[in-house]
Regions:
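The feature encodes a structural signal of leucine-rich repeats
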Residues: 1-2, 20-24, 42-46, 64-68, ...
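Concave beta-strand-loop units of leucine-rich repeat
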Residues: 7-18, 29-40, 51-62, 72-84, ...
Length: 140
């Protein structure tokens, strides 16, 4: 992978043999999909801070510690990332698009930090209440 210098977009969905060591070569991509890449950890995420779009759906080892490096992305998909909490998403306030579907630990407190988003997906986020939605009314 490290020899693909002109590559723009890479989809590695379900490539469960990809590890943190392989990810360090992908920081210059525009778009990267790592859905169900089960061996990817927070250690790899720091190499992806310059991407435009990143999909980490169902990457169970990703935590708040990893996503704090992703504050400059345009689009981030964290679908079913079970270890993401309010603490992690507060670092994502500059994003344009964020998917938090099935992120069961996200509460009203977390989404109030997301005022610059244009698109936010919160399907099956059971801890979001009217209070959290009220903050979204102030989205700029």
């Amino acid at each position: 992978i490290k020899h693909l210098g002109k590559l723009h977009t890479l989809d590695l969905t379900n490539c469960d043999q990809i590890t943190d060591d392989g990810i360090k070569y992908l920081g210059k991509l525009h778009t990267l999909n790592l859905t169900h890449c089960d061996q990817i950890t927070d250690k790899a995420i720091k190499h992806l801070s310059n991407l435009h779009t990143l999909d980490l759906s169902c990457c169970d080892q990703i935590t708040d510690e990893g996503i704090k490096h992703l504050c400059n992305l345009h689009t981030l998909n964290l679908y079913d990332c079970k270890n993401i909490t309010d603490e992690g998403i507060k670092h994502l306030s500059k994003l344009h698009t964020l998917n938090l579907t099935c992120c069961k630990k996200i509460t009203d407190e977390g989404i109030k930090h997301l005022s610059k988003l244009h698109t936010l997906t919160l399907f099956w986020c059971d801890k979001i209440t009217d209070e959290g939605i009220k903050h979204l009314g102030n989205v700029k």
